[in-house]
């Protein structure tokens, strides 16, 4: 991340490392402001922000004077898994962090596209929307920009829509449960977790 350049229009603060450190600071403020006390939740939110741009070194390029990092959110999954696997063997934790990494741009993408409630429901099947909005907000605020109000627009919009659907802070429901696998003939094992 150190030395991985970013477009100065969107990231005047400098390289990806500086941006990531600023995002961590912003997330700490958000967690304090939101009175989030659950230690496990705080941990996966912080690791979500720490890992959110790990894909940038693999895709950053300069084209016609513009620096882009297309698909960095997807390319960040593999290095996130590699990093997190050195710290823990808790699959659920790693999956939660990687889901935040993979989807951290979604609130802005959905907002800018004025997406339907159906699209928001699809997102809900992948990630806790409230947690995602916290990571997205920290990402947006973790840079040297003057108009910080724009950071709140997308996340507030998405949370409002999710609240309409009553899915803003729902746990992700398992699409396949252990009993479904047993019914298919699988024997219970650690792989079920």
Where are these regions (language model features)?
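A generic alpha-helix surface/boundary motif
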Residues: 21, 74-78, 114, 174-179
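Active-site flanking loop/helix segments enriched in acidic
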Residues: 1-24, 57-66
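Short linear loop/turn motifs
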Residues: 2-5, 97-99, 190-193
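Divalent metal-dependent catalytic cores for phosphoryl transfer on phosphate-bearing substrates
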Residues: 15, 28-153
């Amino acid at each position: 991340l150190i030395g991985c350049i970013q477009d100065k229009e969107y990231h005047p603060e400098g390289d990806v490392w500086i941006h990531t450190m600023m995002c961590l600071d912003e997330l700490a403020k958000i967690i304090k402001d939101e009175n989030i006390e659950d230690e496990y939740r705080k941990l996966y939110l912080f690791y979500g922000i720490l890992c959110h741009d790990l894909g940038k070194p693999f895709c950053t390029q300069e084209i016609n004077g513009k620096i882009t990092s297309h698909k960095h959110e997807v390319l960040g999954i593999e290095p996130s898994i590699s990093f997190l696997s050195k710290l823990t063997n808790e699959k659920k934790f790693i999956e939660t962090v990687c889901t935040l990494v993979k989807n951290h741009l979604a609130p802005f993408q959905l907002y800018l596209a004025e997406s339907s409630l159906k699209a928001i429901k699809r997102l809900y099947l992948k990630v806790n929307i409230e947690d995602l909005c916290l990571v997205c907000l920290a990402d947006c605020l973790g840079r040297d920009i003057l108009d910080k109000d724009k950071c709140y627009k997308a996340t507030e919009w998405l949370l409002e829509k999710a609240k309409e659907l009553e899915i803003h802070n729902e746990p992700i429901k398992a699409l396949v449960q252990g009993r479904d696998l047993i019914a298919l003939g699988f024997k219970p094992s650690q792989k079920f977790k």
